[in-house]
């Protein structure tokens, strides 16, 4: 089974009574009080409040998914400021390096917004290059939507829907290439998979690197009678655009 700790910003937990996040303490209590839960997954972490204590706890806890969802939205400093995000490109880069150093083999996910008012072609290209360079394991992209009542609604430099769509497509193309490279590393490897659905050819499941509904799947080809909700070891035999294909380890040659 899997327990998801989810919120728009779970690193804000406890900040109504303290000057710093209490998420690490909460996670420690959950680990100690849920011995029958196979995976514990955190969704989502504010880049400004990811502590060393939290990262070390994730790294040291076998049942906590080595999965960090870090919604950065953009990487250009001017756009970040316009979005009212008090963090810089250098700080984001440093945090990503720290996460990957502290949690070896971590799955790193982010979400981005393209077409924010006044985003120039140069600023957008900076974002594309960042996606190519950092190689997020998982990535979601949203097209900026002008919503009445928001601060950005009145911003000058609103971008046409055509350009916003073009930018969305460019980011997705860049990430498809990254995803192909990321998935290729799993060929021949054996990973833990949580079985979720029976299919004609076998089962659908998820790896530790795949959050429910937003990430990829693992197609498990088998004629065995396996139990939904259980974990099995799967040897990866093929890759799809965002998904993996494999078979139970005891069936592999």
Regions found by a protein language model. Name each.
Residues 1-121:
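Conserved SAM/AdoMet-binding glycine-rich loop
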Residues 1-13, 68, 90-97, 101, ...:
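Proteins enriched for Cys/Gly/acidic motifs involved in redox and nucleic-acid/cofactor modification
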Residues 5, 42, 70, 111, ...:
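Conserved, mostly hydrophobic/aromatic
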Residues 7, 44, 72-74, 110-114, ...:
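Active-site proximal loops enriched in glycine and acidic residues that flank catalytic Cys/His/Asp
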Residues 14-36, 82-83, 146-177:
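Radical SAM enzyme [4Fe-4S]-AdoMet core and its adjacent flexible, acidic
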Residues 54-55, 127, 220:
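Short beta-alpha junctions and helix-cap segments that line functional grooves
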Residues 154-253:
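Terminal RNA-binding accessory module
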């Amino acid at each position: 089974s899997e327990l998801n700790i989810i919120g728009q910003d779970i690193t804000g937990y406890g900040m109504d009574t303290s000057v710093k996040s209490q998420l690490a303490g909460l996670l420690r209590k959950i680990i100690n009080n849920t011995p029958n839960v196979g995976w514990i997954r955190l969704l989502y972490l504010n880049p400004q409040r990811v502590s060393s204590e939290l990262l070390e706890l994730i790294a040291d806890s076998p049942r906590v998914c080595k999965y960090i969802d870090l919604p950065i939205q953009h990487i250009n400093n001017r756009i970040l400021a316009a979005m009212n995000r008090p963090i810089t490109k250098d700080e984001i880069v440093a945090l990503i390096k720290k996460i990957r150093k502290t949690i070896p083999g971590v799955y790193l996910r982010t979400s981005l917004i393209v077409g924010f008012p006044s985003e120039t072609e140069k600023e957008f290209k900076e974002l594309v290059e960042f996606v190519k360079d950092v190689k997020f394991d998982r990535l979601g992209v949203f097209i900026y939507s002008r919503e009445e009542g928001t601060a950005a609604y009145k911003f000058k430099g609103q971008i046409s829907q055509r350009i916003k769509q073009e930018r969305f497509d460019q980011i997705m193309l860049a990430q498809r290439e990254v995803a192909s490279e990321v998935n290729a590393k799993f060929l021949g490897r054996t990973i833990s998979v949580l079985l979720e659905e029976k299919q004609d050819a076998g089962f659908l499941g998820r790896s530790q690197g795949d959050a429910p509904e937003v990430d990829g799947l693992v197609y498990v080809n088998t004629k065995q009678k396996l139990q939904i909700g259980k974990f099995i070891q799967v040897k990866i035999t093929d890759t799809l655009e965002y998904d993996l294909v494999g078979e139970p380890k005891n069936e592999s040659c």
